[in-house]
Regions:
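Low-acidity, Ser/Thr- and Arg-rich intrinsically disordered low-complexity segments
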Residues: 1-12, 16
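A short glycine-rich, His/Asp/Glu-containing loop-to-beta-strand
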Residues: 39-73, 80, 164-221
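Extended, compositionally biased flexible segments
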Residues: 53, 60-128
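Conserved hydrophobic/aromatic beta-strand scaffold that supports enzyme active sites
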Residues: 61-65, 115-117, 137, 185-189, ...
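Glycine- and acidic-residue-biased ligand/ion/polar-headgroup-sensing regions
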Residues: 77-100, 192-193, 205-255, 261, ...
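Conserved metal-binding segment of the jelly-roll/cupin
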Residues: 109-123, 127-128, 250-271
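Short, structured patches in soluble enzyme cores that scaffold and shape functional sites
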Residues: 120, 128-130, 137-141, 174, ...
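Double-stranded beta-helix
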Residues: 132-171, 239, 277-317
Length: 317
């Protein structure tokens, strides 16, 4: 079961149900777990997630495009934020410090990430220094104070995970243990024909072992997609053990897939490299998860990492 937002009249619901304000129930389906992009290529917001839209507790997200000289200003309020530079260069002025020429890669397939973490109560202004500048922002409620921090490409640990055609690259932007309260953020590259988030895993219940060690966290997750060619696509399945949720989504450029619970593997179409940016928040600042026992055996069959990895590296910057 999953707790619902405090504004809901319900307290706890079966895993397959989300609460709809104003009454009624709605099952999680491919139609409400996939947010299709309406990007026109113009400046402005081209992907957006709210807790109201997702019917969950924590994650907000917006991806926006700015041309050179355009600015996006706001205040973190009672939230902690991460701004991930998808492409281009910007200047960021905040009440917690100023950051000049943030960003370097022209797009996510051409370099490692820059990002900025801001805690609550911070005013900020992001000004694009290049045309077509793109930034993805995520924010969650917080009741703690943490220092602002610029994350550079050298700060993002790179992991080549899996094996054979289940190989992928993970860049940790805000990993577990980062000086924040709830946010976790990684970006993942999956070469064409490969699987990622595989074997399927879940993080939808908070569990500790007999020694008190966390073995699974209850986390909401956003998948924000980019493909290296505009016609590319990936498939993502979200399902629970009892199949009360079993949804298959075709994800294209700038689409968002919501993972409120359940297992959630991805496969990238042959010929196209899939990128997704993951934001997570929930019961712990963690990535603790549990594999689907039906598929965990595949790990024993891996013999090596796909030679197409890494897709991006510090050498590109």
């Amino acid at each position: 079961t999953r707790s619902t937002p405090s504004s809901s009249r319900a307290i706890c619901l079966p895993a397959s149900i989300i609460y709809v304000s104003g009454g009624g129930e709605m099952r999680y389906t491919a139609e409400n777990l996939l947010i299709r992009s309406e990007d026109t290529g113009a400046a402005g917001v081209f992907a957006h997630v709210t807790p109201q839209r997702a019917e969950w507790n924590y994650l907000h997200m917006a991806a926006r495009r700015l041309d050179a000289g355009m600015s996006y200003a706001g205040s973190t309020g009672d939230y902690e934020y991460v701004h991930v530079i998808l492409g281009g260069v910007c200047r960021i002025k905040t009440s917690a410090g100023e950051f000049e020429r943030v960003g370097r890669r022209p797009n996510v397939f051409a370099g490692m990430p820059y990002a900025l973490y801001l805690s609550r109560g911070v005013d900020f202004e992001i000004t694009a220094l290049t045309d077509g500048f793109e930034v993805a922002s995520c924010w969650v409620a917080t009741d703690e104070d943490h220092p602002a921090r610029l994350i550079t490409p050298a700060d993002s640990a790179v992991e080549l995970r899996g094996g054979n055609n289940a190989s992928r690259q993970i860049n940790s932007i805000i990993p577990p243990g980062f000086d924040c309260q709830r946010l976790v953020c990684v970006e993942v590259y999956t070469p064409g024909g490969n699987w990622s988030s595989y074997p399927p895993h879940k993080h939808d219940v908070h569990r500790v072992d007999e020694a008190g060690k966390l073995i699974e966290a209850d986390l909401e997750e956003i998948y924000f997609y980019k493909l290296d060619k505009p016609e590319g696509y990936a498939y993502q399945r979200v399902y629970t053990a009892n199949r009360s949720i079993d949804a298959l989504m075709l994800a294209q450029n700038h689409d968002v897939v919501l993972v409120p619970e359940g297992y959630h593997p991805v496969v990238s179409a042959f010929g196209y490299t899939t990128y997704y940016l993951n934001f997570l928040a929930g019961s712990a600042q963690s990535l603790a998860n549990t594999d689907d026992p039906a598929y965990a055996w595949v790990k024993s069959q891996w013999t090596g990492i796909d030679p197409r990895l890494p897709v991006v590296s510090l050498d590109m910057d």
